[in-house]
């Protein structure tokens, strides 16, 4: 309805063949918050979990002109010379903070967290995500936990599991927010990854999941999330999962 109505058309934006809710619109944020409230009010849930895809990915040629640029130009942030990147992060911050506040107002025991992409440099890029990760990690106003998707092995050529984990744990300076590490069970036993060394690791090293849990524990993480459920039961990953379970008991 929004996309077809002239008054609300900007609530839903078309970009590269897809339709997106516009985070810069208060009506959009209210819709999402109300959806979360409906769940927490009517169902006995332990938590609300979200991925972090709030904005599409832009390029250097359109980052300042595409998508919600019209809302940015009309904003006080534009008038005060703040960048569109700062504006977009602020829209996401407002949404996340409103969700957290709504959840806690209904039931303080319900947990709210977000599972961002594992590469912090991508999260802080000018062109995508617009996740204010350092603020979220070091404030009690946005999330109860962060669960980075560190879906790489120790042998990844650029994003090695240990180095990425170290960076996340260092970023969580205040300890106000729990850090759970997302583990890629779906890769175990498969010939997958970036480069021959990582592919070999996932395919042949039945200890890879166990070693990731042991390493992250040593660095002080608060827990783990395993993606995805079906691969905890699959034949392909069975050997790695069996060894993983031994360090989870």
Which functions belong to the PLM regions below?
Residues 49-57, 81-129, 176-186:
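Aromatic-lined carbohydrate-recognition surfaces of secreted/lumenal glycan-active proteins
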Residues 138-158, 168-249:
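Substrate-binding cleft of secreted/luminal carbohydrate-active enzymes
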Residues 1-42:
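Active-site-adjacent "subsite" loops/lids of carbohydrate-active enzymes
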Residues 1-15, 52-79, 197-201:
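Aromatic- and acidic-residue-enriched segments that line the glycan-binding/catalytic groove
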Residues 49, 58, 105-106, 111-147, ...:
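Substrate-binding cleft/loops of secretory-pathway carbohydrate-active enzymes
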Residues 32, 39, 48-51, 103, ...:
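Conserved, mostly hydrophobic/aromatic
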Residues 27-39, 124-141, 161, 201-217:
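Short, acidic/polar
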Residues 21-23, 74-90, 121-123, 151-154:
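Surface-exposed cleft-lining segments at the edges of enzyme active sites
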């Amino acid at each position: 309805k929004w996309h077809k109505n002239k008054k609300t058309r900007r609530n839903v934006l078309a970009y590269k063949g897809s339709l997106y809710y516009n985070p810069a619109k208060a009506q959009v944020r209210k819709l999402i918050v109300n959806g979360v409230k409906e769940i927490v009010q009517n169902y006995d849930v332990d938590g609300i979990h979200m991925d972090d895809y709030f904005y599409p990915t832009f390029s250097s040629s359109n980052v300042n002109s595409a998508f919600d640029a019209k809302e940015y130009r009309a904003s006080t942030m534009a008038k005060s010379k703040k960048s569109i990147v700062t504006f977009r992060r602020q829209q996401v911050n407002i949404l996340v903070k409103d969700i957290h506040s709504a959840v806690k107002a209904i039931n303080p025991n319900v947990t709210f967290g977000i599972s961002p992409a594992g590469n912090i440099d991508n999260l802080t890029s000018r062109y995508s995500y617009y996740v204010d990760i350092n603020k979220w990690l070091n404030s009690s106003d946005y999330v109860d936990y962060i669960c980075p998707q560190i879906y790489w092995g120790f042998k990844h050529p650029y994003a090695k599991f240990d180095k990425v984990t170290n960076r996340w744990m260092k970023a969580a300076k205040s300890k106000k927010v729990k850090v759970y590490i997302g583990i890629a069970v779906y890769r175990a036993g498969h010939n997958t990854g970036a480069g021959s060394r990582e592919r070999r690791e996932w395919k042949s090293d039945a200890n890879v999941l166990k070693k990731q849990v042991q390493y992250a524990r040593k660095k002080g993480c608060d827990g783990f999330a395993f993606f995805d459920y079906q691969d905890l039961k699959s034949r392909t990953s069975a050997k790695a999962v069996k060894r993983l379970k031994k360090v989870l008991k």
